[in-house]
Amino acid sequence: MESMLNKLKSTVTKVTADVTSAVMGNPVTREFDVGRHIASGGNGLAWKIFNGTKKSTKQEVAVFVFDKKLIDKYQKFEKDQIIDSLKRGVQQLTRLRHPRLLTVQHPLEESRDCLAFCTEPVFASLANVLGNWENLPSPISPDIKDYKLYDVETKYGLLQVSEGLSFLHSSVKMVHGNITPENIILNKSGAWKIMGFDFCVSSTNPSEQEPKFPCKEWDPNLPSLCLPNPEYLAPEYILSVSCETASDMYSLGTVMYAVFNKGKPIFEVNKQDIYKSFSRQLDQLSRLGSSSLTNIPEEVREHVKLLLNVTPTVRPDADQMTKIPFFDDVGAVTLQYFDTLFQRDNLQKSQFFKGLPKVLPKLPKRVIVQRILPCLTSEFVNPDMVPFVLPNVLLIAEECTKEEYVKLILPELGPVFKQQEPIQILLIFLQKMDLLLTKTPPDEIKNSVLPMVYRALEAPSIQIQELCLNIIPTFANLIDYPSMKNALIPRIKNACLQTSSLAVRVNSLVCLGKILEYLDKWFVLDDILPFLQQIPSKEPAVLMGILGIYKCTFTHKKLGITKEQLAGKVLPHLIPLSIENNLNLNQFNSFISVIKEMLNRLESEHKTKLEQLHIMQEQQKSLDIGNQMNVSEEMKVTNIGNQQIDKVFNNIGADLLTGSESENKEDGLQNKHKRASLTLEEKQKLAKEQEQAQKLKSQQPLKPQVHTPVATVKQTKDLTDTLMDNMSSLTSLSVSTPKSSASSTFTSVPSMGIGMMFSTPTDNTKRNLTNGLNANMGFQTSGFNMPVNTNQNFYSSPSTVGVTKMTLGTPPTLPNFNALSVPPAGAKQTQQRPTDMSALNNLFGPQKPKVSMNQLSQQKPNQWLNQFVPPQGSPTMGSSVMGTQMNVIGQSAFGMQGNPFFNPQNFAQPPTTMTNSSSASNDLKDLFG
């Protein structure tokens, strides 16, 4: 990379040095800026050709420079001869003006170091193009190195040279004397021009007589720059020292041979022995056959052979050569016509331009761009010719790249965009609008192209408006959206509303309908559809245009019309239009069809919406009912909780609610609340309830204060009382339970020895009861069974203080007393013998009359005892209807057998005091004194 940069730097430095050294100080530099070295030309390619511009007009030129350093090796007189020869050729060229001759724009200027003059812009010499790169900058420019001549360029170039020679021979009476590839210059447009008049010979006879051209003898001692190129020189010039116009035609033949033979001449001449070489050449020419001209096209081969004939009079003259069939190629004729265009009138030009589109595809792009395009754009100054020239220019633009279009064509189109007359100009532009919008830069589109379209819409000519409206949809997709929305659409609407032409109004509606797809939905709904209601006319074509826009918007997948718009604006507008009297049957059917489609969609969309709303309302109702149920359940649960709390405090000693049950209920409440959608007030209420429940759980269990009884004076233990109590208990165990009274609301309680178990706090055992039980009544560790009705109040006596209105819970909470008291099935009842109490007789004191224990035990039970003893054969707990048993073995319980008020059976209180038993009284007196 670095070596490449160094090489480039050295090249630029060298070129700059060459220019500086060659041109510096030359008067040409006062008026022209000299650019880079591009080519070489002239005799021996001695002239270096540079790009240049004129300082005053910035016009592009070519600067020819001869550096005197090239002839430093010569002696002074030889230098002078060379300089004089070069000056003579440039001066002669400057005096001659012809399209086929190189145009000199600034005459020759001489300085101490160089000779210089300026011409029209130049590409290269024909010798450079054919591969002779002498005196060219290094490296060779790719433009020259890769340059290949097209057939049409070759044909027309040779035709141009022939025309130039015809001008010299016929008009100027001059022989050029050195027609070579070095002296044929290709200008910037590709035209072939003649230069190098260093050895030209003018006729010595008056113009009306036969021209006579003096000829100088060949002097091999002269410098090569003072002699013509012998390889292209006619034989008679050397051998017979004569020259005439035919000598130039021989040179033309050798040039044609070189062009078709890659730049090589037909003969190579030994300059040291020129005469011998030409003699040998003369023999070869006399025997020249077609085999030697195989590289030359067949249609021109015979003419080249004639040009190379040894006899000058046989050679065709220049005028004859311009008319040979070889040059009748359509491309060459077209290029020739362009070169003579300035001589034609408008009618001839118009006819030529009309046929040009058929020829352009046959020509190479380089030829079109270099040769034809400049001629076409030069006609833009003639408004009458613009409609004929513009289609060809736009056709060329299609084949150009975007860069070429911007550089070569767009600057020329700028003034044409602003022309409104003739109207064909706008039509042509509108037809090619897609091309313009594709290749024109965005800034130029906004500044030049779209304003032309706007002017066409606002033009007073109805024809222009119609054409514009018809063409706009074809390129609407290329217009940027802001320009379309803010500039184009408003002008189309104005054209529709303000015109008096039905065609313009209809075309406006059709145009809008075609460009709807490039607009957004809300712009159409808010701007286009309301505009339709402003159209005043009711002609069928207008009404169908309105219907078309509605239908297009309604059915387009990108646009669409909302049901609100349909119901509120579209249908109220369309329905009255549908019954206009001007509409025929088909048009009416079209209206009705669109209206029905709109109604169907309106119905389906709104019905769907209402169905969805209905479903949502039903869901909301179900949620509201659920919330109400949740609230009622919450209130019920709260009431139950309150009742349970009341029972906790009112039923001390009863079956209390366990903590696990309350927790389960709280969890159930929480789950219900979670499942329901709660309002903020309900959530606040739930939070408060949770706080209260948490407080209740966190409180310590109620512990009644233990009152220690006042110590009483110790009394002597009465063993007799204790014994009697024990005996009564033992006796009750052997007695069967009597049958329960049907009228009693209490379940029968077993005999006196059966204990009923309650899981009560310990303070219940300390509580003084008024039902006849002692507060210090002992607990039993063994459980007994008893039938239980789970819905029965055990303690309904108003005298009961410690326990009130207790209702047992569900049956599974009842203990099972069955296992201890019910004998196995099938067991025989054994006859119980009286208990022998004689062993206890010694417990009585001697001071009292003795009554044996057996006598006491055999006394009949009184009426009180019958209340607590079940009759024989009465159902036991095993036959209880509930079938629910509570096993409380191992639990502490207090005995209720001593209190007959717990469960009286078959007992009726007499109205009077029970009669005292005399025997019993006597026995007690005997027992206790």
UniProtKB/Swiss-Prot annotation:
Region: Necessary for interaction with AP2 complex and clathrin, interaction with clathrin is necessary for its targeting to the TGN and endosomal membranes, residue numbers: 699-929
Coiled coil among keywords: yes
A Pfam match: Pkinase
Subcellular location: Cytoplasmic vesicle, Clathrin-coated vesicle; Golgi apparatus, trans-Golgi network membrane; Endosome membrane
Keyword field: Coiled coil, Cytoplasmic vesicle, Disease variant, Endosome, Golgi apparatus, Membrane, Phosphoprotein
Residue stretches of each HEAT repeat: 443-479
Composition bias type Low complexity, residue spans: 695-705
Stretches with biased composition (Basic and acidic residues): 684-694
Residue ranges of domain Protein kinase in the record: 32-327
UniProt feature coiled coil, ranges: 661-701
InterPro entries registered for this protein in UniProt: ARM-like, ARM-type_fold, CIK-Related_Protein, Kinase-like_dom_sf, Prot_kinase_dom
Amino acid composition bias (Polar residues), ranges on this chain: 912-922
GO cellular component terms given for this protein: clathrin-coated vesicle; endosome membrane; Golgi apparatus
Membrane listed as a keyword: yes
Associated clinical condition: Arthrogryposis multiplex congenita 4, neurogenic, with agenesis of the corpus callosum: A form of arthrogryposis multiplex congenita, a developmental condition characterized by multiple joint contractures resulting from reduced or absent fetal movements. AMC4 is an autosomal recessive, severe form with onset in utero. Patients manifest little or no fetal movements, significant contractures affecting the upper and lower limbs, dysmorphic facial features, optic atrophy, limb fractures, profound global developmental delay, seizures, and peripheral neuropathy. Many patients die in early childhood.
Family per record: Belongs to the protein kinase superfamily.
Subunit structure: Interacts with clathrin and AP2B1; the interaction mediates the association with the AP-2 complex.
Entry protein name: SCY1-like protein 2
Native source organism of the sequence: Homo sapiens
Gene: SCYL2
